[in-house]
Amino acid sequence: MEYVTHLRPDGTYQSLREHEEQVAALAGSFAGEFGAEEHARRTGLLHDIGKYSANGQRRQRDPEHTAKVDHATAGTQLAFQMKDPFAAFAVAGHHGGLPDGGEKSNDGSGTLWARINKHLTGGDEPSAWKTEIHIPEKVHFPEWIFSEKDSRGRTMYTRMLFSCLVDADFLDTETAIQGKQARGGGETLDCLLKKIRAHTAPWLQAPANELCAKRNSVLARCMRGGEDEKGLYTLTVPTGGGKTLSSMAFALSHAVRHGMKRIIYVIPYTSIIEQNAKVFADVLGAENVLEHHSQVEIADDGEETPEAYRKRLACENWDAPVVVT
């Protein structure tokens, strides 16, 4: 029997094995940024094993005449059996959002424990996955999640793992149905750092007046500060002191110094976001800066330019070097 998922416009199906393996590969590549590649790969393999059940396959092949099937519980339960609550949460919520943990006595509710307690029998039993994919019993976990003195690090890790899985699942499904989309793009942060240095070099060399000299002092300190160790930093400068470019210079310098790949610039008020985003786009290039907030109009009318289309896609998962929000 061929196990399938995702009906394409041409009437063919994506194989379930292909989807499982490609979601695992994508999730692993995303999670590699925080040392969780192996763990995310296994989570990707777990996420859709419920579709290997008889009812799951009937639903895939004839959705109009078949009731919805809970395909997330099987992977959730297997993750729990593997003593992997992180993956259990991620798999349980990969369509509806992260569930509450609940209580061990829960039954029939939307909590994680209710899924773990659910009894899969007959047409919902998905053991056929074992004929197509290999899910490793043991994987490497980042050591830092177990060294935290409280649970905050582990809850953040769960959300990060969940995010990697959901993005990978969405992207592979999109590719299977619509073909490869114009995602990604933009220059490296190293290139953007060179741009901001080139833009500000004339100011540093010859300040026009005393105010410009003070702005230069702020800028120079931010650039030097970017070389410091990771941590939380504050920049306290009066209005007119040049915080916009100085703070971005710090961010780019710091990110390049520590091998990071994205700047997320978070500020209040949409008017200020729009103003700062324009400054960054003028210096760094519009193709490298994504402005995303409640007032951004994202057209989907078939008339948009390739660049506008790429930015609309980037708003879905912030796939841009610099995000201003």
Q: Where are these predicted regions, by residue range?
A:
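Conserved Walker A/P-loop ATP-binding site and its immediately adjacent core
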Residues: 260-283, 296
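Walker A/P-loop
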Residues: 228-254
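Conserved pre-motif I regulatory segment
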Residues: 19, 200-236
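Alpha-helical scaffold elements adjacent to nucleotide-binding pockets in ATP/GTP-utilizing enzyme cores
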Residues: 74, 78, 90, 250, ...
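Pre-Walker A (Motif I) flank of P-loop NTPase domains
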Residues: 228-235, 261-262, 319-321
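Post-Walker A helix-loop "phosphate-sensing" segment adjacent to the P-loop in P-loop NTPases
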Residues: 253-262, 284-288
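Inter-Walker segment of RecA-like/P-loop motor cores
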Residues: 285-325
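Accessory nucleic-acid engagement/destabilization modules that flank
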Residues: 1-198
